Amino acid sequence: MSGHSKWHNIQAKKGKMDAKRGKIFTKIGKEIAVAVKEGGANLDGNSRLKDAVAKAKAANMPNDNIQRAIKKAAGEGDSVNYESIVYEGYGPSGVAVMVEVLTDNKNRSAGNVRSAFTKGGGNMGTSGCVGFMFQKKGEIVIEKAELDEDEIMMMALDAGAEDFASEEEVFIVTTSPEDFGTVREALEAEGLEFLEAAVKMIPDTETAINEDDAKKFQKMLDLLEDDDDVQEVYHNAEFPEGWDE
């Protein structure tokens, strides 16, 4: 499956994440809050909360922050109700884009997302216009470092992974959404740490874009990722060689 090129430069990726760490933690905290309100504060009985906590750990969110978010959502301190919405549309060159939002104000979110699409040379479409181009999959990204490829591959496949890929700096483990938690926990039990661990939408194919369109599309991505309501942005753009997304 495509969509993994962003891991070609681990240090650049980590640097970008460090710069946005506060915003990333806030967004993950919102996911934790929604998970607790839906299924309670007990990790063992709430798979959505387990997934959110795994995502938090992969982003190096301190355990104190994680526990504080869980306690706040479980108590009376957080009365905000968030709605989950997925917006779909197109970027430059017909790139397919899906935007996952958690919001307490649909009108605000719709306006902000539409504006980001327009400013980035694209347009927001109707529900379902690009969703069929993606598959929902669990994805676990592990930095290679000194790890043995065959050993990690066997661990992943034995745990129930669908696919294992070795890229320049990372191993990428792909699972079905249903098996994601089981595979993630099996790899965690082996002492592995993750750069990323989440259920996401992965494109079936990629759309190549030139440098001019890449600049426009990067503007769209930056606007969306800076929006407090936007949790995730998925797309099928293939950036030009050497482009640092």
UniProtKB/Swiss-Prot annotation:
Q: Which UniProt keywords apply?
A: Cytoplasm, DNA-binding, Transcription, Transcription regulation
GO cellular component annotations, sorted alphabetically?
cytosol
> Which Gene3D superfamilies did the record assign?
1.10.10.200, 3.30.70.980
Pfam family for this entry, one: Transcrip_reg
Q: Does the keyword Transcription apply?
A: yes
Location comes to:
Cytoplasm
Q: Which GO terms describe its biological process?
A: regulation of DNA-templated transcription
**Gene Ontology MF annotations:** DNA binding
What's this protein's family per the entry? Belongs to the TACO1 family.
Q: What is this protein called?
A: Probable transcriptional regulatory protein CPE1954
Native source species: Clostridium perfringens (strain 13 / Type A)
